């Protein structure tokens, strides 16, 4: 924050609108590419961050950046930097209904040699705005691209949903078409409390959750479903994850551990709360009651995940295996344009 420079002060001439800041450099981390700046963002310059060590290997496969508008509270670069500090084996960015931050994500990850997984969390309820509500309704579907073809298919599916809705901020996915759109190139995680499995469990107990899991398997294929166990340090995490793991075992599908991160580190918690309040157009005290897990929605090391999920080491191991199977470099999907001579001048 700028302070101590009143309009017309001796060290900075002012105007009737405040101090003249035209010569001041942009704040670090703003990218220099906001509408307020006339220059383009420069190349990412990696900090000298030592890779953390963890006795337990782990990769995060469900994380939101600030490109999940007013939901994620850390830029993609910050997520990568924190993943480096924690010693994560790979990182996925799964923003809501878009790939808006993946170039920044991929550039930062490349500097640290970190494998990248690309995905998105789809909002399946049609024509529902995410703003102006404490807890926007609707079911979510978390999709990871298994490879470049999966990325292309997911990108096309998201673009179609935006175009069909025809209004900014609204989407309309064709649920029947989703079943075929992946073509074996998507991996479906059952997601957070907004996912079909958790919603069914919360509303109808184990019988409803069993039915929801069967429907997911029938829709997307047995080999394309993984039951997500979220670790956010909540009092009921153990009980809920035990039930979910039992459902997965009964259906013969694997589990995977995630944090459902919405910011890089605990220091961003207050910012995340403030952004959620802005999204809901309410105050922090009100929104806090709707976000019980926000305090723990940050990246964690493998050692910490092992402490939070002591009964599910296989879910932690599976995160590493899935990341290894799904990771690819963004350059692999760059368009191969023909060479074109450009005259001088």
Please place each PLM-identified region on the residue numbering.
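Phosphodiester-processing cores and adjacent nucleic acid-binding clamps
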Residues: 1-345
